[in-house]
């Protein structure tokens, strides 16, 4: 009888430990998935805000019949991405400047790097030409 009680206690302990481990794994997995959903939602919200902002800039330029203007490199990237058609992989944007640093090159197959997003565009930021490759 003593052996059966000991076996039952040991078995109960093993089962309880297994359930606790599974519960913790499930919590960790759920937490990981939840964070992934939050990140995806934040990225979608940011993309929507960027799209609205670029639409506003482009409509304003179209209305005034002026060249597209960009304040930051991120604005340039989003304008080029919006104007690109087909299977375009790279774009070179020339700014009206007549200076040595009036070209910006973008790889449209990848998102813009974080360290380039807030760089100010030279001169007034008017786009002279865009060449796609």
UniProtKB/Swiss-Prot annotation:
Disulfide bonds: none
Signal peptide per UniProt: 1-28
Presence of keyword Chloroplast: no
Native organism: Staphylococcus aureus (strain Newman)
Family to which this protein belongs: Belongs to the CHIPS/FLIPr family.
Keyword check for Nucleotidyltransferase: no
NCBIfam families xref list: PRK13033.1
Protein name: FPRL1 inhibitory protein
